Amino acid sequence: MFNLLVLATTNQNKVREFKQFVADFPVEIKSLSDFGPLPEAIEDGSTFDENAYKKALHYSKVLGIPAIADDSGLAVEALSGAPGVRSARYAGDDATDQDNCRKLLAEMKGETNRKAAFVCVLSIAVPSGPALTYEASCEGTILDAPRGSNGFGYDPLFYYEPFGKTFAEISMEEKNKVSHRGKVLMELSAEFDKVMKWLEKRVLEEMPEQPDHTEFKDNDWSR
């Protein structure tokens, strides 16, 4: 079985998290940090799906091995899905989490519809092009002031009703059980043996016109 994957990130927290979810499988996980300087992927897509695939395919081609990448962010209903793919840069390319939260609060001032969702898309690509994609979301509401000191990004503003708290008021362990990213990783790990077999077949083949993904229950492209 093919047993080498690169996780398209230099964030070691993401690497550790991913390794925990696939710990029971005979696979070696590398990160971009293991390969030295590499050309950066251009994430100019208009959707999370596009950016996750662009990143996964880019690093898969550069390194010649399967790559896994994710793209995630906050989608606010009253803002037509914004911040969306610009979640990390909502207040500018060099914006801090606090800057982004302040801009979101300003945009939402006086708005009664506070519905929002965190969205995460994970893409697994091989050098010739075929990919699997997994997507999950977590719904909540945007408060009119931050609460809590845990987490990062928009967590202090994202109120999760089942817990009666914001994501910044709960532990990382609690968050991972219900968050968009945690759900995606649980879906992937539930059928990771199938994913590895799929990769073994696809890693050296030419890109088919329409890859067959119907065997994957939770893979969105199979629908």
Whereabouts are the PLM-identified features?
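Anionic-ligand binding patches
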Residues: F2-V6, Q12-W221
